[in-house]
Design a protein with these regions (language model features):
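N-terminal Rossmann-like dinucleotide-binding module
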Residues: 1-51
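Active-site loop of classical SDR/Rossmann-like NAD(P)-dependent oxidoreductases
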Residues: 16, 258, 276-289
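Rossmann-fold dehydrogenase core element
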Residues: 109-127, 148-150
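Predominantly a Rossmann-like dinucleotide-binding segment in NAD(P)-dependent oxidoreductases
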Residues: 128-200, 207
Length: 322
């Protein structure tokens, strides 16, 4: 087993990479932020402010050819994820791709084929599965704490009507579902371990080719599911798992530590509520470390591309129906 740090390269100098994932790579045990590829030296200098040894590659291709890069993180606009993910794999680099991995499930299928051909790890940067709040929710449902599951519902919203923001640009894969729908859909699938049987309904509001609000319902084996996403509403994020014996509520389930404190509330039939509070954990650091253990020690990664594909199938159905 190789014990040397995983040397990471980032394709692009996206603001999220500079403020969140870059610092997470730098802080993670067994990881090193080695290089950033960008045409802008000024943007790369923003990474050097916290990772002094980071090198500047002037093109994505140059970074992928770098023999001193062990893994690649891709925070590019959504419509570029799969193409550059495949190029990274073909260059012999394991790759962590920002969510959503693809524009549709057929794109993810191409990426899965490239992953299998390369024999390397490729995964979606889906950080919530590395947070103890979500891991605890999955365990509590599995051990029967709330009894047989009958319904799941979720909500994720924030307000952003800036036409210049990538979330509001159709050509690059903008819209609320791709940005935050992955969480209310994928989170339900992660905790329950199930895939939906069918789409029951979808109502989608559109502005300039991007979905700004979506309300959706799915039927699963033994339980129903409802959620909404909005990028034109005041901030809200919650997940609820309704069982025959109790209700499990996850507060601040998607931006723990930023939006609010991560808690898990268990409401039981005797009218008691048990609250579990989770310490502040950087789920992005946890994600980087888990990816490193997967490629260095062969540990199973919690969110493989097949999981991303399952969420994308749900998203594709809502977008098509709406």
């Amino acid at each position: 087993m190789t014990t040397s740090p995983v040397r990471w390269g980032i394709l692009g100098a996206a603001n999220f990479a500079k403020t969140t994932m870059g610092p997470a790579i730098h802080a993670a045990h067994g990881a090193e932020l080695a290089a950033v590829a960008s045409s802008s030296a000024e943007k790369v200098a923003g990474f050097a402010a916290f990772a002094s040894g980071v090198r500047h590659h002037h093109s994505y291709e140059e970074l992928l050819r770098d023999p001193e890069i062990d893994a690649v993180y891709i925070p590019l606009p959504n419509h570029l994820h799969v193409a550059w993910g495949i190029k990274a794999l073909e260059a012999g680099k394991p790759v962590l791709i920002e969510k959503p991995v693809g524009m549709d499930f057929a794109e993810i299928d191409r990426l899965i084929a490239a992953r299998d051909a390369a024999g390397l790890l490729a995964a979606e940067a889906y950080m919530i599965v590395h947070h103890p709040q979500w891991q605890r929710a999955k365990a509590l449902l599995a051990d029967g704490t709330i009894g047989k599951l009958v319904h799941v519902n979720g909500a994720f919203s924030f307000f952003n009507d800036d036409a210049g923001n990538i979330r509001n640009q159709a050509a690059s894969g903008g819209g609320g579902l791709r940005d935050i729908g992955v969480y209310v859909m994928g989170g339900a699938r992660f905790v329950t371990g199930q895939e939906p049987l069918k789409l029951d309904y979808a109502r989608v509001q559109w502005e300039h080719g991007v979905d700004t609000f979506a309300d959706m319902g799915f039927a699963f084996e033994g339980f129903t599911y409802q959620a909404y996403t909005s990028i034109r509403s005041a901030p809200r994020q919650e997940m609820h798992f309704h069982g025959e014996k109790g209700l499990m509520t996850l507060t601040c389930p998607f931006n723990a530590g930023k939006f609010d404190q991560a808690e898990l509330h268990l409401s039981m039939p005797d009218q008691t509520v048990r609250i579990e509070r989770f310490p502040v954990v950087n789920q992005y650091v946890q994600q980087v470390e888990a990816f490193g253990r997967a490629i260095r020690a062969g540990e199973t990664y919690a969110w493989p591309l097949e999981q991303a594909r399952g969420t994308q199938v749900m998203m594709d159905q809502v977008l098509a129906a709406g």
